[in-house]
């Protein structure tokens, strides 16, 4: 068969890289005008961000002075044609008209501004520039929303970015020059607040709309990917790149020129010859293949050094094409990185290796489609490949096989068209990827070039005249736990994320000044956890080691799982000055727990960039003075320092005082004295509004009815590196019922009716610190604050002054007013916040009732603790509306409950007093009634404990409304126990001290039951327990035993003397009558027999039935878990209150029986013996009571 080597080459079609496209049948010429304008604007923002007339003229020259209605229309068409969606005519016309109007008014404003610059003291020029600013500002506030009309946000996005940039520029003017124009300080500050708010608002809209536009596109075929990538690229150039510079308009953060960099990558169209109108996408890679093969994963910023291309060929017609390649790049400060082979390492020709000694700013490529005739009957073979590329650098060109016609400058035009492209280029080549697909009968291969903006410098050089912004992706090493992730859209590139504490990244910097110079730095970051960042300089080339130069807190800015937005990103303050160790130097950055090793590490830290500025003595003094002035002025409600702001805490004032104290006497002595007087005035105002007595902890328990009351283990300590004044330490406690506590009552006379009050303070560290505010009910919070450990850098011990005091001017972790915790209306206080607040509402006040308000701090476990100070209790605001109605309702409910409590108390007190009085012979309460037994005392005690509100349930040392009557009766109960114990001659008869005082034969146990009672257990018949007891011959005694018999046999308690006179009590687990020797009686007729003793002794279980809830009809089935019917004061909020006195006596379970007998000894010694015949005998108590004469 004869081979036909003829083939047809189809040239690259314009529709693969269109300069004009068809939309709805209409031919619209677009070119790249919107991209040209945007690139020129970005170049201007990179190099000329200094405010003033020059900046405004630049905006006119690059945008607003050259763009008319047709150009604005081209901005809209640029996106419309990609998303195949037209803006509604009304919206289009309104947007173009508004843009034209804004441009006209901006030109007038610039004229007025330039006139004022030339004659700044002329009232006429000042008035005119204010008028023109206000007109333009109002138009922008009105018109910018028209550039985000619902449904058309994506095609309007590029003009939205231009208008937003203009608005931020003039707002910055008003903040910088406003007071010189004649605006008030209040007006300037209001404009600054709007500037900050709009920076976030505009940046977030740009990023969110960008993502929404991409998400709305189809994602199936190769052509879908082409559209997707073009939209991604064009919106990056015309929107996101501009939005990345929005934060630089914050002139208070950037008082001098910042040096911004764009590290993001954009991708030009694949070098694949394809005509979507004539050819099928079946021979091309799918959307997913393109996205996974052509687009690189997020990575550190790298620089292209070498490209080696491997040439392949197709046998039919011997057609050579780009078959694969390898890229060698480098990281700034790091070594070379060799990529894996893209495509195939073919060897049909020797590999072409190109080492570029400069940036590749342009490629001219030749992608081809060859229709190759194969031997019959095979169909023609479609071969798509790249047959040649020319790479251009500013000084040279490098050619692979041949030069093509597909020019990268048509997609990424120069940023400056006034000079040749080798000087005015906007992007440089940074990488190349490869895509392919094969089948029958076709083979498709293509190269995709990625590009980075030229603003991303090839070194991290510190310019001493500017604020140097260095994206952290320009480091050379990230450590385990750190990853590079796709940026949120408004950062100008990818960012770093770390999900655990540890080393973050290492980067190399070059210093363009003497090595002895000192610098400051700060971070732009977002974090869902509190952390501390440590910067080491002089690290090894691996990024390990070095000396700590910066140690500063990064406070939480977002919640876990929250999306990254411009609002979630914050800046730290500039650090204390530090020096580099070498030139170039290695910076190591790590993240550590903010509060020490025990801190919770859940959450993530994201860092966008580090910013470095030169610092000198004058700069430091001016910076410190500016910061101190700002902090002092922020304390007051107005410039005349009449009143403090409500949110200014006492701790805050102390920290501001430290700032003032640390100002340089050499550079700003007069200013320091003035600020010191102001901050002292602020401290006095703070003391005046604080309703707490002795807020500085001069003493505890100094006065019975005033100031702080607390447990004896609390310590007061002097100021340290955290507190300027005294603070208290609350240690743990070994018994929950005896907590460590600190409390104070706010007198009723200090409170205003229907007002909200706030308790707040500063906690250095705490574990389960309980905080209460109590009036009608309790507001309660449990606060955990891991300790800071130390505020000083890790490289040095806490410095001290010449007299041993903390040196608060030494470099340390700086105070951050944003570290706050607010607990309002029952909300849970966030953990790990040093500042706490707790609110409570007060209804009507009554000086006669003197209810007042209790402030309580409590620690109730051994391992817990707290250190706190700067406590304040102050009036917050009058109650209105719903809050007023709520407190009135709470007050009414409280009064209703108080009335019910009073009625209940009258009844309960009467019953309790009668029970207590019945124990004694007379009203002197010095002798017990003859028939008073332990059960009767328990029963009386039970009734006393039914008196509610004897003590506050939150802290039982604070008396409640019924404290006086409770303590009166409880004291008599205590007396009854003492008299009863004096009358019982058996020692340790309740076995609470084990077998102390008892003689033991055989195996016996003392067990603590579930009701916390100790019982004697005799499990074997040969065992015996006995005790010798001294008695008075001729006197009568009562032997009383409470016991339980388990199983067969009998349990016996015998009393006898040496020779005779023996008596015993027997216990069995049966219902048959038992015959007792001598004067004993059966279980069933014992009560009747007792009547013979003229009522002196009543039922054997008198008192016990009530105190223990005993029921003789319950079967004697021994239960290991007692069926408690415990008694308390009926409130149950405080389980420890019943421990006061003997109120914790617990009842016996069912099955226990109490028996007694009379005994008249003839000698001075008797023996009590306990034993059993079979089974198990359990004895609760043995008593031998002397009868009254």
From Swiss-Prot:
Example GO biological process: symbiont-mediated killing of host cell
Question: Has keyword Translocase?
Answer: no
Q: Which GO terms describe its molecular function?
A: signaling receptor binding; toxin activity
User: Origin, by domain of life?
Assistant: Bacteria
InterPro entries, per database record: Cry1Ac-like_dom-VII, Cry_V, Galactose-bd-like_sf, Pest_crys, Pest_crys_Cry1Aa_dom-IV, Pest_crys_dom-III, Pest_crys_dom_I, Pest_crys_N_sf
Supply the alphabetized keyword list: Sporulation, Toxin, Virulence
Matching CDD domains = delta_endotoxin_C (cd04085)
Q: Sum up the protein's function in the record's words.
A: Promotes colloidosmotic lysis by binding to the midgut epithelial cells of many lepidopteran larvae including Spodoptera species.
**What is the protein named?**
Pesticidal crystal protein Cry1Ca
